[in-house]
């Protein structure tokens, strides 16, 4: 009887350890989806947390030589393209034949990547298509892990349904539908989190759901509804402010995030989408650092 009790106890302990390991893994996977979906939503409007980005341009110089053995008989022709006044530049390839030589140079430049300098650019639909297609592969593994836990099966199945909808809207290059369908995907994350993570993690996701709701509503410029969503976000964030654990660990971060959230709400009185995006970007950068 003693041996049976010991074996049963070990089996239960191993089972609990396996469950805890799986929960930890699923929490990391939810964090991945959190970052991935926010980044994808930002790309729709050319928003980035980086104020500068590096880009490159290739320029080609051609030389033709008549091979005559006379002084000053060589004629060179060079035609650069791109702005050489920017930073960087190095030769990447050099090819020659009997009478001609060509040299290709890659010019590296630093470009401003703020809201006001990027918003007039077209949405990179090809990039979005690639990101969503890659998400299918990631989700198949994540869904399998979630099925091993106490997560509602309907909520798990809903992700694939919404992912199909988002992919179709991206394929159709429909901006408004794309943002709404990506938001539906993100809104599932707190439901998953409540089964595997602590209250802090879930409360942060709930707060971001409301802020992303406001972000998506900028397409309609419905400022009254945007303000309501941000009021909901402030109420959700109250759970973070009142949480002793996270305040002990990072009180400065909690306070700064709250200030930026209030500033985001106040800026809606201006009723300017670009100003909203600037404040939205600052808030999202800060709250992502709390996790």
Predicted regions and their residues:
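C-terminal motif of bacterial Sec signal peptides marking the signal peptidase cleavage site
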Residues: 5-9
């Amino acid at each position: 009887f003693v041996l049976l009790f010991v074996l049963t106890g070990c089996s239960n302990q191993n089972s609990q350890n396996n469950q805890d390991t799986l929960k930890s893994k699923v929490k990391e996977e939810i964090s991945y989806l959190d970052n991935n979906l926010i980044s994808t939503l930002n790309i729709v409007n050319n928003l980035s947390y980086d104020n500068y980005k590096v880009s490159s341009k290739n320029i080609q110089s051609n030389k033709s030589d008549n091979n005559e053995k006379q002084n000053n008989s060589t004629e060179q022709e060079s035609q650069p393209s791109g702005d050489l006044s920017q930073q960087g530049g190095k030769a990447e390839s050099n090819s020659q034949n009997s009478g001609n030589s060509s040299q290709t140079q890659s010019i590296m430049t630093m470009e401003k990547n703020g809201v006001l300098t990027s918003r007039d650019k077209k949405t990179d639909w090809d990039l979005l298509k690639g990101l969503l297609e890659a998400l299918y592969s990631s989700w198949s593994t994540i869904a399998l892990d979630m099925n091993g836990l106490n997560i509602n099966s309907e909520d798990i199945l809903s992700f694939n349904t919404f992912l199909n909808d988002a992919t179709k809207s991206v394929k159709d290059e429909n901006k408004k539908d794309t943002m709404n369908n990506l938001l539906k995907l993100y809104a599932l994350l707190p439901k998953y989190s409540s089964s595997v993570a602590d209250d802090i993690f879930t409360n942060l996701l709930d707060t971001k759901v409301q802020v992303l709701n406001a972000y998506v509503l900028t397409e309609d410029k419905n400022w009254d509804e945007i303000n309501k969503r941000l009021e909901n976000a402030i109420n959700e964030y109250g759970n973070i402010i009142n949480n002793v654990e996270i305040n002990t660990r990072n009180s400065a971060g909690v306070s700064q995030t709250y200030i930026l959230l209030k500033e985001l709400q106040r800026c809606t009185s201006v009723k300017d989408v670009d100003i909203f995006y600037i404040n939205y970007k600052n808030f999202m950068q800060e709250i992502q650092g709390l996790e």
